[in-house]
Amino acid sequence: MPKRKSPEGAEGKDAAKVTKQEPTRRSARLSAKPAPPKPEPKPRKTTKKEPGTKANKGAKGKKDEKQEAAKEGTTPSENGENKAEEAQKTESVGDKNE
C-alpha cells in the first residue's frame, strides 16, 4: 500500500497537487453590498398547562376489571357468530315482506 504524501515532503510533479490553495476572493461588487439583515424571529406562543389537568392513565398493558366487564357485552362475537345473527335477521325481514 503506498504511503501518504505530506505537503512538507512533496517532490517533483506531485508538489503542485499537494500545495495548499488560497481561498478564492469575493468580487468587489459582492463585497460592496452589506449583508441583508436577518428577520427577527417571531415569539412562539406557549400554552400554559394546569398541573392538575393530567389524567391518570394507569399501568401500561393492564386493563381495569371495570373496563373489561363493560367491553364484554359490546364486543362483536368471535368466529363469525355475529354474521350468522345478522343473516337470520335479514331472512326474517324478507319473510315478513312476502
From Swiss-Prot:
A single MF term (Gene Ontology): nucleosomal DNA binding
Region (Disordered): 1-98
Basic and acidic residues biased stretches: 1-25, 39-52, 61-71, 80-98
Subcellular location per the Swiss-Prot or TrEMBL entry: Nucleus
Keywords carried by this UniProt record: DNA-binding, Nucleus
InterPro entries: HMGN_fam
GO biological process terms on file: chromatin organization
Domain of life: Eukaryota
Family matches, as PROSITE patterns: HMG14_17
TM regions (residue ranges): none
One Pfam family from the record: HMG14_17
A GO CC annotation given for this chain: chromatin
Keyword Transit peptide recorded: no
Family membership noted in the UniProt record: Belongs to the HMGN family.
Designated name of the protein: High mobility group nucleosome-binding domain-containing protein 3
Organism name: Gallus gallus
